[in-house]
């Protein structure tokens, strides 16, 4: 990490751009192109001071009037010597500053490299580093609150407590191994089992929170399904209030899933417009239909659209394929195009929709009130749909300090640790030898340590930080 790096840290479109520079020669390098308007040179300034002056390139040609913030190691975001240059948000000015830095030997930062350096320099553990990306990507109050809680170390604190209990268990087991010939007991099996139960309970709670955390972070998944040409893409566009999906009278226009995020009453939803389900010999369309069924299986809420002009056999064929997959999911049955069909056809379609849920919808979370007519094109009864979505999300209130798992990597590590603890409990109950029980305990500790980055490979680190933006 001896190289000095730089990158634009702000998004395009504002009035000011911030260029971040970090590394051993950050202050020295910037001082070569920055002339303070009064006071000491940049290299003599104390940490966390902001200096006004001219940024010069091409000899001493003034490029812009800027503010330069100096942060000295280890009291910076990265833990290194750091400078932030706040300039006017001209793309030309920004480009010239970056080119000047590159000409002086500074390297363009890789995605997430500033945060990776913060992690490697001990400024934050890996779970808190990942929270930085979640904070930047947050689109709702709940997602923001979870990211802040993790960034402040709430999750790390929980993991630290778990690791301490596991270390206590391991040390007791290994002490007995060291004194096995002297028949010394450092803890009875009942006490060890009680400690295991406590650890099991906490890990289970954390792992169990992932379904909520993932929905908060990525949006509650809502699958829009039905036969071809029922208005699924029109409904997606109406929900998002923008033309995201292509709408056409030609059957099979949507051949792959189209997604969009929307926040309703503080809850983020991820709507998935899917390919229409029908019998087809088109290979590409069949692949799209298979993906429809996959997305439906992964969703929490399903919106089944029915075309009121379809006959009973068509409706039943679709219901037979879709409704069994909706088991355990919230379902709304929406008879679309109420603005263009006669009341009799509309009534028959609604009647058939209700019959099909009764016939094929075993285990589906559905009530008769969850069936109604809409016009996705005209917006008829869309307010009722939005109310249904918010009520169906069942998103618990998240308070400051709540620890909820939002990251797939963390969840998978917790599941592995939980399996290790169950092996320990089985071993203790069955009289398994102490060395084998200790090995399961050490595996649990390794899995928890992987979350905070204490035993993480370079490949995993690379994958994590590659998902960050350049300036982070």
Label for each model-derived stretch:
Residues 1-145, 149, 153, 325, ...:
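A glycine-rich (often HGG/GG-containing) alpha/beta subdomain
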Residues 304-306:
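Redox-cofactor binding/interface segments in oxidoreductases and associated redox assembly factors
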Residues 107, 268-270, 365, 370:
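Conserved beta-strand segments of alpha/beta enzyme cores
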């Amino acid at each position: 990490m001896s190289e000095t790096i730089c990158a634009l840290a702000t998004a395009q479109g504002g009035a000011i751009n911030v260029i971040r520079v970090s590394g051993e020669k950050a202050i020295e390098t910037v001082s070569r192109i920055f002339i303070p308007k009064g006071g000491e040179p940049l290299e003599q300034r104390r940490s966390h001071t902001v200096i006004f002056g001219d940024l010069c390139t091409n000899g001493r040609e003034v490029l812009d009037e800027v503010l330069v913030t100096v942060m000295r190691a280890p009291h910076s975001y990265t833990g290194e010597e750091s400078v932030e240059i706040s300039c006017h948000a001209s793309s030309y000015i920004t480009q010239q500053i970056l080119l000047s830095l590159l000409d002086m030997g500074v390297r363009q930062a890789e995605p997430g490299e500033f945060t990776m350096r913060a992690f490697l320099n001990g400024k934050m553990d890996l779970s808190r580093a990942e929270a930085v990306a979640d904070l930047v990507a947050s689109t709702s109050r709940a997602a923001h609150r979870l990211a802040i809680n993790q960034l402040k170390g709430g999750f790390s604190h929980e993991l630290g407590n778990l690791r301490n209990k596991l270390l206590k268990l391991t040390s007791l087991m290994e002490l007995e191994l060291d004194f096995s010939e002297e028949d010394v007991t450092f803890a009875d099996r009942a006490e060890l089992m009680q400690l295991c139960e406590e650890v099991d309970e906490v890990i289970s709670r954390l792992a169990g929170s992932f379904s909520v955390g993932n929905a908060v972070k990525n949006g509650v998944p809502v699958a829009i399904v039905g036969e071809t040409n029922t208005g699924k893409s029109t409904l997606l566009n109406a929900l998002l209030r923008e033309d995201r999906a292509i709408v056409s009278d030609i059957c099979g226009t949507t051949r792959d899933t189209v997604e969009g995020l929307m926040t309703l009453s503080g809850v983020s939803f991820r709507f998935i417009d899917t390919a229409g389900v029908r019998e087809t010999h088109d290979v590409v369309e069949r692949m799209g239909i298979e993906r429809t069924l996959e997305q439906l299986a992964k969703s929490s809420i399903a919106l089944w659209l029915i075309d009121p002009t379809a006959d009973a056999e068509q409706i039943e064929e679709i219901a037979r394929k879709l409704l069994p997959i909706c088991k355990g999911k919230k379902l709304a049955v929406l008879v679309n195009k109420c603005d263009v069909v006669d009341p009799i056809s509309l009534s028959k379609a609604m009647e058939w929709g209700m019959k099909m849920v009764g016939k094929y919808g075993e285990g589906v979370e559905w009530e008769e009130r969850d069936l109604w007519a809409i016009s996705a094109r005209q917006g008829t009864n869309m307010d009722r749909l939005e109310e249904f979505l918010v009520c169906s999300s069942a998103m618990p209130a998240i308070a400051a300090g709540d620890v909820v798992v939002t990251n797939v990597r963390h969840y998978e590590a917790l599941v592995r640790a939980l399996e290790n603890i169950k092996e320990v409990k089985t071993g203790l109950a069955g009289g398994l030898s102490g060395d084998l029980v200790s090995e399961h305990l050490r595996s649990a500790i390794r899995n928890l340590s992987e979350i905070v980055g204490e035993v993480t490979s370079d490949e995993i680190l690379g994958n994590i930080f590659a998902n960050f933006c350049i300036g982070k």
